[in-house]
Swiss-Prot record:
Glycans are attached at residues 377, 395, 419. This is Solute carrier family 2, facilitated glucose transporter member 12. Residues 1-28, 96-103, 153-158, 213-272, 333-339, 481-492, 544-588 are cytoplasmic. It is found in: Cell membrane; Endomembrane system; Cytoplasm, Perinuclear region. GO terms for molecular function: D-glucose transmembrane transporter activity. Residues 50-74, 125-131, 180-191, 294-311, 361-459, 514-522 are extracellular. It is a multi-pass membrane protein. It catalyses: D-glucose(out) = D-glucose(in). The chain crosses the membrane at residues 29-49, 75-95, 104-124, 132-152, 159-179, 192-212, 273-293, 312-332, 340-360, 460-480, 493-513, 523-543. One of its GO terms (cellular component) is membrane.
């Protein structure tokens, strides 16, 4: 998810302290108290990942229980994103106003309430409300947790401790998929899916009361003495004056830029923002949110017929996300973020084309990917019988279609209502030539069965797509953004790119099932593949190579107003370094 707005805050805080290395003291030491504090705070990451992944399996039961239409399923999924988008716009202000620790406590309590709401009040409305509150909770906690851990950690251990949150996110997604499988065949299993995580959220809220406030937040509020005491406890040393001075200098640097500078030519900030927004755009437009939210639904449609099989297959996606994230975290400094972005985008394109080609052979299975198959909503020709026929009260179009069709066959009929359900009483015409017969259930022939190799080819391609995203656009898009913006305006720049991220996530998730019904899943996948190719081209042309380079050097390169033009014209300043020395030396 995302939806990966959490990853952006992770990388932001991991790198922000390095923007002015000459002013930051070397903070050493990573005692048990710091590790414990980081683990407790990082539980928020587990909660975020769980909430992003659990709806995939819950929808398989909810769509039949609540008779959800295609559009209603999209709204259920997108409700979380609506809440997250709204929260992302004000999240930075809230954590600065009330504090990082207080925000985490609030979001944990809100998450408990939001998960229990649809369980206690089983209705479509309560489900939507609960998902919106969950979106608000995970968006705020994503920001607050990473900031809190980064501000507690010593500089030399900050990357490792903040990365713990990202690992917890993918672990939460895996946990959600496992729960989807375990409760797939349980009666009202969706209630267990929603309720299982609430005790952990409640325990985190209680545990956070015993952890210290962020020293940076205390200094921002003028409590320098309290901040000094917290640092002494965290660093196990009395010499904290140098670090206090560095924190104050960092806070002062944030006021050198104004928000509107992001849209101006100062230091070529407008071009930098364009790069950041485009990367956020590609994170979502390549289809990753739909693989996350609709994994079980899609896998069920390609031949994993039972709910349990689809949920088990989607669990593999969670495993791959966890395994793939580890090398991305530990090898990025050696390989480089741009290389990971290129490899990830290329593999994503190939994987999506593979799934699309397979799905062309199974098009009939995708046409009804999100329809509710109940007795009341089967097609007229497939379920028509004589006598009373019950039609769902919300299915006006089918009722009108039935009456029109019966009039054309000269059959007699009349309608009544019983307990809110329309009953259509049909009598066969005297002339049997009209062909009124009760159809026998269709028995699927062996030729209609989906070949095993196609099912597993589709699954393996989806796993390759997830792995490619987890080493590419997933974490690296936010890493690049953390390196292209100056420290003084980085937080405000991330607020804009975060809004783009959540907004595109909302748009993609809200339209996936509808567009799939309109054009078919194969063409949706081909469209995502095309966007992956576009992402590859964009990265090659416009994203700077940041491997092993100081942030000051990267910023200096991007500050050149002709940077974008030079990229389009394939002119790179590095070529000047390849000029033989003999050609520029004067003759002796």
């Amino acid at each position: 998810m995302l939806a990966h707005s959490t990853a952006q805050d992770l990388i932001l805080q991991q790198r922000s302290s390095d923007d002015h290395p000459q002013t930051n003291p070397r903070q050493t030491g990573c005692g048990a108290f710091i590790i414990l504090s980081s683990v407790i705070a990082a539980i928020s990451g587990l909660l975020v990942g769980y909430e992003l992944g659990i709806i995939s399996g819950a929808l398989l039961q909810l769509q039949s229980l609540l008779e959800l239409t295609c559009q209603q399923q999209e709204i259920v999924v997108s409700a979380l994103l609506i809440g997250a988008l709204v929260a992302s716009l004000v999240g930075g202000c809230l954590i600065d106003l009330y504090g990082r620790r207080t925000t985490i406590i609030f979001t944990s309590i809100l998450l408990v309430f939001a998960n229990l709401l649809p369980v206690v009040v089983v209705s479509y409305g309560s489900l939507i409300a609960g998902r919106i509150f969950i979106g608000v909770s995970i968006s705020l906690s994503a920001i607050a947790t990473c900031v809190y851990i980064a501000e507690l950690s010593p500089q030399d251990k900050r990357g490792m401790l903040v990365s713990l949150n990202e690992l917890m996110i993918v672990a939460g997604i895996l946990l959600a998929y496992i729960c989807n499988y375990l409760f797939a065949s349980v009666n009202n299993g969706w209630k267990y899916m929603f309720g299982l995580i609430t005790p952990l959220a409640a325990l985190q809220a209680v545990a956070m009361f015993f952890l210290p406030r962020s020293p940076r937040f205390l200094i921002m509020k003028g409590y320098d003495d309290a901040a000094g005491k917290v640092l002494q406890k965290l660093r196990a040393t009395t010499d904290i004056n140098e670090e206090l001075t560095a924190i104050k200098s960092s806070i002062k640097a944030e006021y050198q830029y104004k928000f509107l500078d992001l849209f101006c030519s100062r230091d070529n900030m407008r071009a930098r923002l364009l790069i950041g927004l485009t990367l956020s755009f590609f994170v979502q437009i390549t289809g990753q949110p739909n693989i996350l939210f609709y994994a079980s639904t899609v896998l069920k449609s390609v031949g994993f017929q039972s709910t349990e099989a689809a949920s088990l297959a989607s669990t593999g996606i969670g495993v791959v996300k966890v395994v793939s994230t580890i090398p991305a975290i530990f090898l990025v400094d050696k390989i480089g973020s741009k290389t990971f972005l290129c490899i990830g985008s290329a593999v994503m394109a190939v994987s999506l084309v593979s799934v699309g080609l397979v799905s062309l052979q199974l098009d009939v299975n995708y046409n009804n990917i999100c329809k509710v198959h109940t007795v009341q909503n089967h097609s007229l020709q497939d379920s028509f019988v004589y006598g009373p026929v019950a039609l769902a009260k919300h299915n006006e179009s089918l009722f009108e279609e039935t009456g029109t069709w019966l009039e054309s066959t000269k059959a007699s009929y009349h309608s009544t209502s019983q307990n809110g359900t329309k009953l259509l009483h049909v009598s066969a015409p005297e002339d049997s030539s009209f062909g009124f017969t009760v159809k026998e259930p269709k028995v699927k022939s062996q030729s209609d069965e989906i070949p095993e190799y196609m099912k597993w080819l589709c699954l393996s391609s989806l796993l390759a797509f997830v792995a490619a995203f987890s080493i590419g656009l997933g974490p690296m898009a936010w890493l690049v953004q953390s390196e292209i913006f100056p420290a003084g305006i980085k937080g405000r720049a991330f607020a804009i790119t975060s809004s783009m991220n959540w907004g595109m996530n909302l748009l993609i998730s809200l339209t996936f099932l509808t567009l799939t019904e309109m054009i078919g899943l194969p063409w949706m996948l081909f469209g995502y593949a095309l966007m992956s190719i576009a992402s590859l081209v964009f990265v090659i042309m416009f994203v700077p190579n940041t491997k092993g380079r100081p942030l000051e050097e990267i910023s200096k390169e991007l500050a050149n107003r002709s940077y974008m033009c030079n990229a389009v014209c394939h002119r790179r300043r590095s070529k000047k370094k390849l000029t033989p020395v003999a050609l520029i030396q004067s003759p002796a």
